[in-house]
Amino acid sequence: MISSSAREDIVQWRVPVAIRIGYGPIELVQGPAEACRYLADRWPFLGGTYHDLAESGCRAAMSRRASVEEARSVFISAAQEACLLD
């Protein structure tokens, strides 16, 4: 049996989102579970309109309550808000 956290990691985006935190290398975020980890642990600041929407959207996509691509779109908006896109 696959655990719920393993199932959450199976949900992937068709196209990963490339972000850069600070002066670090470009990192590819593959799906909503990974995006949630970035939003919670690696984001330059917590809060913000799109940060909060991305967190809830990614959680909803992981539990199949929302579209995976909608979660990707709001994650991209959060990355733009945090100046993480090149």
Predicted feature residues:
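Homeobox/homeodomain signature
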Residues: 7-9, 29, 52, 58
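Short, compact, well-ordered microdomains
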Residues: 53-86
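Short, charged/polar N-terminal "headpieces" of proteins
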Residues: 1-16
